[in-house]
A protein has these predicted regions:
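Residue-level marker for buried hydrophobic side chains located in beta-strands
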Residues: 26, 143-144
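A short, structured active-site edge motif that brings together acidic residues
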Residues: 52-65, 82-87
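N-terminal, active-site-proximal structural segment of metallo-dependent hydrolase catalytic domains
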Residues: 1-48, 62-63
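Conserved beta strand-loop-helix elements of the APE1-like EEP
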Residues: 48-50, 64-81, 180-196, 225
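Metal-dependent phosphoester-hydrolase catalytic domains
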Residues: 85, 118, 122, 129-143, ...
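N-terminal post-signal-peptidase region of extra-cytosolic proteins
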Residues: 4-13, 57-58, 172-177, 206
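Surface-exposed cleft-lining segments at the edges of enzyme active sites
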Residues: 1-4, 31-32, 82-88, 111-120
Length: 225
């Protein structure tokens, strides 16, 4: 996510997230200690720019002298946090699920395989199994957000919606950010967990802080509950 189009865009993205007054952020395609990013622990650095936020990073695979993975960062401190390796299967790369349990909700993120729908389905099954077993009876709403690399109407999207309700708008594209034509990023809630009132949802294309197309190749998706 960071440094894809412009060098050292951490502050730009932090300013954008502060602009929308975010409380929790799911982040995909993070580097940790890689050569290409000059050995920065990207999520830790970003969380510090947000004001010493709590965070959890999960490494999906070794990459370029360091690691590559996903993460969640939150304004409040988590009561529990962990990551779970997801099956690569016939997909292109290993993937990971990252979870942060807060006092009153649970939020997790993943980035499904970008090549194989078969691999995506295996990854979805383990994500759902993990979150149901750990939090299905927790009395807390459970949210999953990230790059699913699949539209809601795809086979992967349909499998997700058996157990997850999509809460964000899906009628507009999220990728690519400069000409969004596919909705492959969304935020969902695990069915059977306490219902939340959705105040609003947006796919964010314009910020006062800067050009979102220079910050990421995906548009950020916001959910207000």
């Amino acid at each position: 996510i960071f440094n894809k189009y412009i060098k050292d865009d951490y502050q730009l993205i932090a300013d954008m997230m502060k602009e929308i007054d975010a409380d929790a952020i799911c982040m995909n395609e993070l580097d940790n200690n890689t050569n290409r990013t000059r050995h920065v622990y990207q999520l830790k650095h970003f969380a510090s720019l947000m004001g010493s936020w709590d965070f959890e990073y999960g490494a999906a695979m070794p990459y370029d002298g360091g690691e590559y993975g996903e993460g969640v960062t939150t304004r409040k401190k988590a009561v529990n946090k962990f990551s779970v390796a997801l099956p690569k299967g016939v997909g292109a790369e290993p993937r990971v699920l990252v979870v942060m349990e807060m006092e009153d909700y649970v939020i997790c993120t993943s980035h499904l395989d970008h090549v194989s729908s078969e691999a995506q389905l295996e990854q979805v099954e383990l994500i759902t199994k993990t979150m149901k077993e750990r939090y299905g009876d927790s009395g807390k709403p459970v949210f999953l957000g990230g790059d699913m690399n699949a539209t809601p109407s795809s086979e992967t999207g349909k499998l997700l919606q058996k157990d997850w309700e999509i809460l964000t708008i899906t009628g507009f594209g999220t990728f690519p950010s400069d000409n969004p034509s596919k909705c492959i990023d969304y935020i969902m809630q695990l069915k059977g967990t306490p219902k939340c009132e959705v105040v609003g949802s947006q796919i964010l294309r314009w910020f006062k802080s800067g050009d979102v197309t220079k910050a990421s190749d995906h548009l950020p998706v916001m959910l207000d509950i």
